Amino acid sequence: MSEINSIANGTYTIGQTSATNFVAGHGIKIDEPSAGTVRIANDETVLYDSSALISMDKALGTTFNISEPVTNFEKFKVYYTRFPWTDQCPTHQIQEFDATVPVNVIVLHTSFATSTATNTSWYYCAETITDVSGTTWKLNSCSQMQLPNGNIDSSHIYLKPYKVIGINRISGGNE
């Protein structure tokens, strides 16, 4: 017979009633979604999820809201895609950031290649997001650089975040 004991808010032990209990380690979430069912998973919280990507051609100055500050977590992941889409670029990408480092700006980036009959070019794109210590994030600037000639075209490409996930809650929110 197994049992689950709550030994503190958000901390559980699992084990046999007469055997050694095993404690869920930091970053592991154990819950009981229904009677007699135990779910063990990573401690992740969805802070923003939009299947409708920001539809503007130009994202500069656009804001979006997350449900709570990422500083309530050890890390956070941003899922994003390039807009407009092309066959040469990865469609969806993920970057993970350390939320314990006090920053207010993050940079999403991607690189991709295009090819024509006479030329193959590598592109690098970077998008800055400001105010990430709060709950209203702003898409601030985006630039594209064509390598190797270094031409910059800031009106051509945008990176669109569509999901933000907090990992391993450390404080605040709905613990």
Residue ranges and their predicted role:
Residues 91-128:
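An exposed tryptophan-centered "aromatic clamp" motif
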